[in-house]
Amino acid sequence: MRSEEIRPATAADVPAVKAVTDAAYTPYVERIGRAPLPMGADHAANVAAGKVYVTGDPAGGAVAGLVVVEAFADHLFLDSIAVRPDARGSGVGRRLLHFVEAHARALGLPEVRLYTHVLMWENQKIYPRYGYELVGRRVDGPYERLHYRKRLD
């Protein structure tokens, strides 16, 4: 896979999807006191449903990042974004966020929505830089989440 390519994940990608997701979210386990939901996702089912898109490493062809998205009538939900720790700072996350927005536009959807755990401070700095606005804070079971949206032009 070329580094700038973003493509639908295939069944052959499932082990890499799990590995990248686990590597990206493991640092948060201790901070939030439990595994973030993406770590327990049914990656094979998400891939089979066409919800997962992967991209390569700028230094090679292995999966370096991914997004899990789901289309609804009025928005595209960004369920998860994960970048392999050794690929952080290389533009992988930026490319994935731009892809999500382009994908929403291609589907004719007016906005992207997502949430992040309140203790994932890093994300609270990243999303506003890309035009996402905080629209709410909710407790969903054991997870306290900040909800964001980005309206697309």
Regions found by a protein language model. Give the residues of each.
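Active-site acidic-Proline motif in GNAT/NAT acetyltransferases
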Residues: 84-86, 90, 118-119
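Short glycine-rich hinge loops at helix-strand junctions in the catalytic core
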Residues: 91, 131
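Acetyl-CoA-dependent GNAT
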Residues: 4, 8-80, 84-86, 97-99, ...
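A generic secondary-structure micro-motif detector
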Residues: 32-33, 90, 113
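C-terminal "cap" of GNAT-fold acetyltransferases
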Residues: 53, 110-130, 137-153
